[in-house]
């Protein structure tokens, strides 16, 4: 994939999610075309009713494919980074776990999403959360300053995933960790799916093979790598693209890895 194709993908993703941000809710993106509420969708992914009720209205947009909070093991005082933070849902939940002495940074490349998240933070009175405009391949975050990175159904949208993992490694402190929910491929995607931009911006066509994800993480320097597919996710992925064969190839997974302490 050349740089022109990279830019075309970024432009399509930015346009798609800008429209979702302005629509005030779940749109034809990772959640698919659906009339189901964002809270209901999130609870099906493992969030509790209490969690979906805790955040400001408009923060939960129903765009995830899992619950990275469940594997992040966040602690009071930690610095947490959310890759592709959207309306701020996971950031606000993380903020409650890390407390006033901690700090949460959300990075998103879509100006409308960053604006929405900042508005939501003001509505909720969050003082330990900030949102920065930037690409997850080139994070606006200093070296070695983050304890934990979370992300929910975003990295599959990147046209340069090795760069995403390399930059994640850069910003993590020694001993820092990744706790990600994302869509991965368990079989090679056919060309007709890979070339479908709607399926790409819908979090399916850009999925990397599980073995490729593991290799990218290893190359970046990570250890204790674990990619755990969630076969039950096929039921909601099927709803993202009715009438297609995407569930013959992709599944949601949790992705965990550690930056060595020394």
Enumerate the language-model features and the residues they cover.
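Conserved SAM-binding strand-loop segment of SAM-dependent methyltransferases
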Residues: 124-137
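A short acidic, Gly/Pro-enriched loop at the edge of an enzyme's catalytic core
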Residues: 76, 137-148
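Conserved SAM/SAH-binding beta-strand->alpha-helix loop
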Residues: 110-112
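C-terminal lobe and adjacent flexible extensions of AdoMet/dcAdoMet transferase-like proteins
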Residues: 18-25, 31-32, 216-262
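A short glycine-rich, Lys/Arg-flanked "PGG" loop and its adjoining helix->strand segment in the class I
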Residues: 162-177
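Short, glycine-/aromatic-enriched active-site segment of Class I SAM-dependent methyltransferases
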Residues: 185-204
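Hydrophobic beta-strand segment of the Class I
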Residues: 80, 149-150
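Conserved alpha-helix/loop element of class I SAM-dependent methyltransferases that forms part
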Residues: 33-79, 83, 89-97
């Amino acid at each position: 994939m050349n740089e022109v194709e990279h830019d075309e993908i970024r432009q399509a993703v930015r346009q798609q999610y800008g429209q979702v941000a302005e629509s005030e809710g779940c749109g034809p993106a990772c959640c698919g075309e659906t009339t189901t509420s964002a809270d209901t969708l999130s609870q099906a992914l493992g969030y509790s009713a209490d969690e979906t009720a805790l955040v400001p209205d408009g923060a939960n947009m129903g765009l995830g494919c899992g619950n990275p909070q469940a594997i992040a093991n966040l602690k009071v005082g930690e610095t947490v980074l959310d890759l592709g933070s959207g309306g701020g849902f996971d950031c606000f939940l993380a903020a409650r776990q890390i407390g006033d002495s901690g700090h949460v940074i959300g990075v998103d490349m879509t100006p409308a999403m960053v604006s929405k998240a900042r508005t939501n933070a003001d509505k909720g009175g969050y003082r330990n959360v900030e949102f920065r405009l930037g690409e997850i391949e080139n994070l606006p975050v200093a070296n070695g300053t983050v304890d934990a990175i979370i992300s929910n159904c975003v990295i599959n949208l990147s046209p340069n995933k090795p760069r995403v993992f390399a930059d994640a490694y850069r910003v993590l402190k020694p001993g820092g960790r990744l706790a990600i929910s994302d869509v991965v491929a368990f079989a090679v995607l056919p060309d007709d799916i890979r070339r479908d931009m709607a399926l790409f911006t819908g979090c399916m066509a850009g999925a990397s093979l599980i073995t490729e994800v593991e290799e990218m993480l290893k190359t970046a320097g990570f250890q204790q790598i674990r990619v755990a597919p969630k076969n039950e996710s096929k039921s909601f992925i099927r709803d993202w693209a009715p009438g297609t064969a995407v569930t013959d190839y992709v599944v949601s997974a949790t992705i965990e890895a550690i930056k060595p302490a020394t």
